[in-house]
Amino acid sequence: MKIAVVTDSSANLSPQAAADYKITVVNDPIMFGNHVYHENEDITTDQFYRLLKVEKDIPTISQISMAEMQVVFDQLKAAGYDQVLVVGLSSGISGWVNNLKTYAPSVKGLDVQVFDSRTACAGTANMVKLAAAMALAGYAIEDIMTQLTRLRAATTTVLIVNSMRHLVKNGRIYNNSSLAGTMVLRNKPIITFNEHGKIQVLGKERTLKNAQQAVQESFSRFVITSQLPVRLDVISANDDAIAEDWASELRYQFPAVRVKTGAIGPLMGVLTGDHALGMIWSLDWKPLLTALNQERQR
């Protein structure tokens, strides 16, 4: 079976990574008022954050339509694929994944499977790259789904935001609704994705430094208890320099961990607002794949 791997643009895959792993990327829509923009198509990450500063209204997220997905499926079928594995951003953020699960059985000539990453940004990207690498190596789609479930269970996403306004406006807070209104000013809210992929508040700190320290302590506990190689992605919303500085500190403190940096793109930026900072840690998918390949050859 020839398997195509599809994801949405909120994973922030580089064009090179998408090409190397033969991943099809579908661009997410966002809305400023009545104007719809698509990530990477008619708005870049830099343009989004510039627009965020000048627009009066808070933007909202939208979702990829099934008509758009059908075009993608038709193209993949014409390219000779038998199966499609869609690895998408959390269903706690967008209804896209659940709509796809409902729509998939109606796609003719393709076996379409859908996997909910229950996260976003680099967290989704790591799962997508594992899926694509396994597909290229000839693994069955059932085996890929098993390993994605394993990686998802070992993935934690924690974000430090300046304000809860964007999350409240978009209705994306799962818990602590009474707390959200008190955290708009003077504090640094810390949020995460829970086991169901919904965004919830972990707590708050008075300063960014204190918030970073709190997040770092959680990461340190994961590293200490993990018996397998760990990957860490430091992500930011229009604060590359701060993210790079933090990543450098973390590389020094955790030399065995593979540390990368990345952006919070427009779709997730709609929810976090400007100057958010985060860490996504998980098992490192590359050593996982190496171990699978070695076991397969025995």
Cite the ranges covered by each PLM segment.
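N-terminal glycine-rich anion-binding loop in soluble enzyme alpha/beta folds
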Residues: 4-63
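Short beta-strand segments
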Residues: 6-7, 86-90, 116, 282
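Mixed-charge interfacial surface used for oligomerization/domain docking
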Residues: 10, 14-24, 29, 100-104, ...
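Short, solvent-exposed amphipathic alpha-helices that sit
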Residues: 44, 96-100
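Glycine-rich, highly charged phosphate/nucleotide-binding loops
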Residues: 62-72
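Short, well-structured alpha-helical segments in soluble
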Residues: 72-79
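Short glycine-enriched loops at secondary-structure junctions
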Residues: 89-96, 117-120, 187
